Amino acid sequence: MTRDLYLAIDVGTGGLRSALVDRNGRILAFSHQEHEQIVPQFGWSEQRPADWWAGTLATIRAVLAKVEDAPARVAAICACGQMHGSVLIDDDGRPTLDAVPLWNDKRTVPQVEAYVARAGTARGLEISANMPAPAWPAFKLAWIAENRPEALARATTLLMPKDWINYKLTGERAQDPTEASLSYLMDWRSRTWSDELCDAVGVPRALLAPLRAPGDVLGGLEPGVAAELGLAAGLPVLVGAGDYPMALLGSGVIRSGMGSDVTGTSSIITLLHDDALVDPQVSNVLTPNGVWGVMTLLEAGGDAVRWARRAFHDNRRSYEEVAEIATHAPPGAGGLFFLPYLSGERVAEKRNSRAQFFGLKAETGLAELHRAVLEGVVFSVRRVLDTLPDGMARPDRIVAASGGAKSALWL
């Protein structure tokens, strides 16, 4: 039988997803299983790798059952996943922590502050092309070293979420450069682990898995897992990449000069460039096809529309209805202007910025209010584009994705 299907896995923050995709990129079957995000205390965010694996098995079984002869038709497996979640495993491949810190875990703020006080930011920026931040795995390891030294002592390898799933599938340990580019441990020029940054942060270099290209075959599907799923042992499992770099690839943002606007809860603006842009105003992520994504994240985004829907309609109207109401106001919303900083703003000079309406008049109605909210987010994106550092050209094409791309008015 022809092997004409590909099994895709996404280790998301909200859940585990699997899909069967044909050679033309059509999704023939899809399955999703939610998993818990654990918040032991304010600022912490954890998940159990065991839950990811359970979700992987369950969703793979589900999609295989939806397509005729699917197990015999699968040609290869590839995973992507949430970035920065730091899984330490021991010699036997067991996580040394039952629950691991995720990308949105803020417990590492003291470690970042201590590092900056000790080493500054200039040298790390020059090597990694990124500023120190609580999300980066380097500082998660620093926190574990200080607070859970026994877990670090038992560990032999650091993996990211999709890498741990890959390990369970193949028994092979590896990371990929897209994940490593946002670890604060990789030299952006050589695209290899940096001994200097490991020493500066206090990360044991021996923990860092070999870096493999996303399109490389990591290994074959383990016989035990294959038997459990009804798949062929030895099926090629690719290295894969982080979820956001994969999303850029999937949306066709693949060459220097292109841009991406992913507006969901927040807005992530990414411009592709041949080289990283070493500037404290931006972050840099390597894409699966080897181009650098110069990115900035705006706290303002779909969350502003969500707030307006709740505040003005008590969530009784759909997002489509809210957008339709906004179409009844003229461009400029009758002189009404909205600053969308409902939870502060990362790129503003003052991070305690707050949202405000300017220009309210007696005749201002819901249409103007909703249009002003949409336009306020767009103006924030434009501000980022207008203040790009020297050396960064304006994009010749921007591809919009996520929830914001569903609104014709917003686009």
Protein language model annotation of sequence segments:
Residues M1-D98, P110, A114, E126, ...:
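N-terminal glycine/serine-rich phosphate-binding loop of ATP-dependent small-molecule kinases
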Residues Q33, P101-T108, T265-S267:
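Short, acidic/turn-prone active-site loops that include or flank metal/cofactor-
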